[in-house]
C-alpha cells in the first residue's frame, strides 16, 4: 500500500537542463506510482522570465516521453508554478515566498518543504542564508535542502560551505546528492554482503586479497574543458563517487539499516582511511593524461578544445587506499577512473585469496572473484574454481552470473527519482554526510597538493586503452592485477 507524501519542493535552477532531463521526469514517476497525489506542489525558480503557462509547457515537454495518458500528465502539471528570481537579491525572496505560500494553501500542504539547489555551487550558501533570513522555511513539518555536487573544491572550501549552510540548516537537514549512491547496483552491495552469510563471513582480510573499484569512460573531455581542466579525474570522480562506493565496501555491519547507523558505520571506515604524505602519494597513486589513439577522432587531451597547451591535468587516476582497521589489515583497495578508456564500465571486483589445498596436480587453484557491475548493465558475476574435464584432478575457473532483467530495469527507479523520494521520507542513508565528505576531501587534498606542485610523474596513455602501464605496475608491486581489462 503506497502512502501519500505531502510535500512542497522548490527547484532552484528550475529551467535548467538537469531539471528538464532528470528532475521533473523523476517527480512525475513518483506521481504515477501514487507517492504524490493531491497534496504536493512544485515551485520552479530561475532568472529566466517565464509565466506559469510557459513554465508548465516546459514541464509538459520534459515528461512527454514518459506517458501516453495526457489527462494524467495535465493533472500532474497543475501542481507546478513558477517565479523568476535572483538568488543574490534578498528582496526578490519575498516574491518566491509568496509563490510558495500560495502553492501550500492551494494544495493544503502544512510545512514539509524541500529546496533543491540545481545551481552553480557559489550560490549554495547565499540561497541557504536567504531562505532562513527572509522567512521561507516552514514553521511546521520539515525543511530539507538538496545539494548537487560539487560540495566544495577542497576541504577548506567545503568546510566554509558547510558552515554557511549550518547557519540555516542542521546537518541532518542537508541531503548532499551523489547520484551514484542512487544506482540500484550500488545499493545491492549491502544486500549482497549482509544478506548472504557466505559473503558476510568472508568479507575480511582472512579471505579477501584485494578490492577493486573501476569507473571508466570512453568519452574524452568533450565540451567540458573549462570545468574539467580544474578538476580532473581526481576531483570529478574519485573524491565523490568512488569514495562513496568504497564506503559501502569497507564499512562494518551497521547496528541497524537506518540512515543513522549506516552513516555511523561508513564514518568509522572513513575515519580509518590513511592520509598519504608526498612520498606515499608517489608510491600509491598514478596520474595520467590521454594521448592519441588509433582513430583520427581520438585527439590527445592537450589538443582538445579549450584545453591549455601546457595543462598538467589528470584525465586518469589509479591508486591504492589503505584502512587502519583489523578487518582490512594488509588488504589494498584499488581505485581507478579515467576518460577515453577502452570501455564504459562502473564495477566492483572483490578478489579472494587463492585456495591452498594441494590437489596433487600441476594446476593451482585460481583466485575467486566476485564482481558487481553497476554500469552500463546491472550484473553480478562470480568466478570460482571447479574440476576440469580432464582425467587428472586439475582445476579450472567457471563463471556464474546474473544480469538485471528487462522487467527489473523497467521497474527500477532512476537514481534521481530514488533520491528525491528518499529526501521526502527523510532517509539520508544514500546521501553523504559531512564527516564522509570532509574525510574524502582531506584524503584527496593530500594528493592534489603533490600534483599542483608538480611533484609526481604525469604519465600518458593511449586513447582506447585501459590507462598507463604504471597503473598495472601499481598492482603488480603487490602481486595483483586489474580484473577488468576493458
Swiss-Prot record:
Effect caused by changing residue 375 to Q: Strongly decreases catalytic efficiency toward glucose 6-phosphate
UniProt-annotated binding residues for NADP(+): 13-20, 47, 86-87, 149
Entry's Gene Ontology molecular function annotations: glucose-6-phosphate dehydrogenase activity; NADP binding
Consequence of changing residue 47 to A: Decreases catalytic efficiency toward glucose 6-phosphate
Keyword NADP in annotation: yes
BP-aspect Gene Ontology terms: glucose metabolic process; pentose-phosphate shunt, oxidative branch
Keywords assigned: Carbohydrate metabolism, Glucose metabolism, NAD, NADP, Oxidoreductase
Record note on what altering residue 15 to A does: Decreases catalytic efficiency toward glucose 6-phosphate
Signal sequence extent: none
UniProt entry tagged with the keyword S-adenosyl-L-methionine: no
Pathway: Carbohydrate degradation; pentose phosphate pathway; D-ribulose 5-phosphate from D-glucose 6-phosphate (oxidative stage): step 1/3
EC number(s) on file: 1.1.1.363
Binding-site positions, substrate: 179, 183, 217, 236, 339, 344
Effect of residue 22 to R: Decreases catalytic efficiency toward glucose 6-phosphate
Organism domain of life: Bacteria
Any one Gene Ontology cellular component term annotated for this protein: cytosol
Pfam families found in the cross-reference section: G6PD_C (PF02781), G6PD_N (PF00479)
Reaction equations catalysed: D-glucose 6-phosphate + NAD(+) = 6-phospho-D-glucono-1,5-lactone + NADH + H(+); D-glucose 6-phosphate + NADP(+) = 6-phospho-D-glucono-1,5-lactone + NADPH + H(+)
Role according to the record: Catalyzes the oxidation of glucose 6-phosphate to 6-phosphogluconolactone. Can utilize either NADP(+) or NAD(+).
The protein's assembly and partners: Homodimer.
Assigned protein family: Belongs to the glucose-6-phosphate dehydrogenase family.
Name of protein: Glucose-6-phosphate 1-dehydrogenase
